[in-house]
């Protein structure tokens, strides 16, 4: 619940769809997967409190969290216990690496993700701006003090320098800000070809609306946080904006999931990429649990937890609905991004890039 419920609810629903289907087909080695559900409200303290309560109730693995900052707080706790943890949507490098600023930093070997990471998104969108949009100049608009936003911004700027994409203006805002007129006026005056805004959907909608009012006609570009932005600005203002996603709607690999999700939750469309990513993340975690069960280990023991972790780590091309899963040395999946364009008020899949 809370400000980011449009991420959290699809994550919950996508994961539960997979687990309910798994249980309906016999579960894992004849055992049903029991889920203890907690609402962290997008807050790190709430997430850790929920984790401690869950441990008291005898959990064997953790699915979550949804937001980057919340997941890092949770990962600090699960790391101490070597508790298997899979997140569908937390993209910062600091989720699996203890200190991203230190090249020699240890990783959290127990933590995995189904989504791609912040630097990967930022680099991909810089490449896309140059290769696909023929951009020569760019402005950047990001949220200070936000791991996700700053991570994408830094990666985009570094890649832009490498590609010769000139950054003509950089603007920022703080959490809770809603009036972006001043920043968008500055960006409009800089007249960039593209504006990279690695922010979440609600703020993205406000920023794009303010930019158009200020006379800025640049193409807005975002990361996966843009998902659902169509609900937060007019179709006219959003037209031509693009973002990268971990989900390619309508493609063969996700059609059955889309049908099942719509039927299960009585909705007309998949809300955003977080539902299918959560479906895959639940699959990854359950495949790990299956490996531990097949070894006859006792749930909750150190050996059991390590077997779950090892099984996920050693996946090599395990098929999910958003792509195949193998993991690099930092427990990040190796997979392409989907490019989504805002067209006629809809978020339309363009290509894998």
What annotation goes with each model-predicted range?
Residues 1-353:
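Extracytosolic ligand-binding ectodomains
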């Amino acid at each position: 619940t809370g400000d980011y419920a449009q991420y959290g609810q699809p994550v919950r629903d996508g994961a539960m769809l997979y687990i309910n289907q798994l249980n309906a087909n016999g579960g894992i080695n004849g055992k049903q997967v029991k889920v203890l559900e907690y609402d962290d409200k997008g807050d790190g303290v709430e997430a850790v409190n929920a984790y401690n309560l869950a441990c008291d109730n005898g959990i064997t693995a953790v699915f979550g969290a949804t937001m980057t900052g919340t997941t890092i707080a949770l990962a600090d706790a699960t790391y101490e216990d070597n508790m298997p943890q899979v997140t569908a949507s937390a993209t910062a490098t600091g989720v699996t690496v203890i200190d991203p600023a230190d090249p020699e930093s240890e990783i959290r070997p127990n933590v995995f993700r189904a989504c791609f990471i912040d630097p990967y998104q930022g680099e991909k969108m810089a490449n896309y701006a140059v290769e696909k949009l023929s951009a020569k100049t760019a402005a950047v608009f990001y949220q200070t003090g936000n791991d996700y936003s700053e991570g994408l911004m830094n990666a985009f700027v570094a890649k832009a320098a490498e590609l010769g994409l000139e950054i003509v203006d950089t603007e920022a805002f703080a959490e809770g800000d809603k009036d972006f007129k001043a920043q968008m006026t500055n960006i409009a005056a800089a007249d960039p070809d593209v504006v990279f805004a690695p922010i979440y959907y609600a703020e993205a909608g406000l920023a794009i609306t303010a930019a158009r009012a200020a006379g800025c006609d640049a193409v807005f570009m975002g990361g996966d946080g843009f998902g659902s932005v169509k609900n937060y600005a007019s179709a006219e203002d959003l037209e031509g904006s693009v973002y990268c996603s971990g989900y390619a709607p309508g493609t063969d690999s996700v059609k059955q999931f889309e049908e099942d999700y719509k039927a299960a939750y009585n909705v007309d469309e998949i809300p955003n990429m977080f539902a299918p990513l959560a479906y895959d993340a639940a699959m990854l975690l359950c495949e790990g649990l299956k490996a531990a069960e097949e070894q006859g280990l006792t749930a909750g023991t150190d050996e059991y937890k390590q077997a779950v972790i090892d099984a996920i780590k050693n996946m090599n091309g395990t098929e999910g609905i958003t792509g195949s899963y193998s993991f690099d040395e930092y427990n990040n999946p190796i997979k392409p991004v989907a490019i989504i364009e805002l067209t006629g008020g809809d978020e339309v899949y363009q290509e894998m890039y």
